[in-house]
Structure formats: C-alpha cells, structure tokens
A protein has these predicted regions:
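Low-complexity, acidic/polar, glycine-enriched regions of mature
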Residues: 1-172
Length: 172
C-alpha cells in the first residue's frame, strides 16, 4: 500500500496514568487507579491512532478494603477473569492532540467490546505526549459492560482520567 507509516511511539509506562472515580449513592465517591498502563501512538497515511492496554490486576483503590474487594470482584471489573482493559481509537487527525476534541474507538472491558468516546483535552506544548501530558477524560456506563451488581450502592457512571506520556523519540 502507498500509505506512509512511521514507527509507533510507545507510552512511557512510568509517566502514564489511568485513574477512575466511582460514584456511590450514600458515601463519598471512591477513587482508584491502575499502575500498569501501556500503549502506543501510531501514524499511518496522515492519520493517527492510539491503543491503550491496562492491566486490571494492577488496580489500587483509595479508601476501605471492602471498596477494593468489590471493585475487583466479578460483580464489577472482574479483573481476575478479564484482566485486559483495552482501547483502540479510530484514526484521527494529528491536530486533535493539540486542539482537543472527541476521541472515538472501541473499549474492551470485562471481555465485552463497546464503542466509546472520550474527551481529549487541548495541549499547549510543541510535542504533545513528550513535552506535556496527553490528557483524556470520559465516562463509561457500568451497565453497558455487564456490571449490574450493587446498583443500590453504586451509580452507573464511572469517570475515567488518562494522562499519557510518550517515550521521546531517540530514547527507546
């Protein structure tokens, strides 16, 4: 094919984070994060794509131990049975990294794949991901991914917050 392809830019796993907030009905919200976040930014034919892979087993929850147990359980993230959380974006214009906007793609969670759209925040640096974070926010419905347990305690929406740094070219 006549497409121009550049080598992928991998995420810097030590500088990239994935965190989330669960909204509880009668208690303060619960925050969590994943300590193993990998991925890459690919360029092909003038468009870019991003793939993100999170190891669900690396889940760390703030707050009481019961929240961590509940979040890891089969009723919620089912991290032991489905440890891979994966997002693959649709191709997008490289200006999206600077200007911000909707980042659309497929999210795989709990062994189920669904369309997802996240908000990519604008950046002010020359090389997004290298000189500053690529910051992505969004929300997913627990119900869409089969997380129907604890509905009396946990609201449906889970807020996601990704901050990505890329390995600088020449430092691989």
């Amino acid at each position: 094919s006549g497409r121009v392809r550049s080598s992928p830019q991998p995420f810097d796993p030590l500088a990239s984070t994935a965190s989330f907030r669960i909204h509880l009905r009668w208690l303060p919200d619960a925050d969590g994060r994943f300590t193993k976040v990998n991925g890459q930014l690919l360029e092909e034919g003038g468009k870019q794509r991003v793939t993100v892979r999170v190891d669900g087993r690396s889940l760390v929850m703030d707050g009481p131990a019961w929240i961590a147990r509940a979040t890891r359980s089969d009723q919620f993230l089912a991290v032991d049975r489905h440890p891979d959380i994966h997002f693959a974006s649709e191709p997008f214009d490289p200006q999206l990294l600077r200007n911000g906007g909707k980042l659309r793609g497929q999210l795989s969670l709990r062994g189920m794949e669904r369309p997802a759209a996240f908000s990519l925040l604008p950046t002010t640096c020359a090389r997004p991901g290298v000189d500053c974070d690529i910051h992505v926010l969004g929300s997913v419905s627990r119900r869409q991914f089969g997380m129907t347990g604890d509905r009396l305690v946990v609201k449906d929406g889970v807020d996601l917050d990704f901050r990505v740094r890329l390995v600088a070219p020449g430092k691989r």
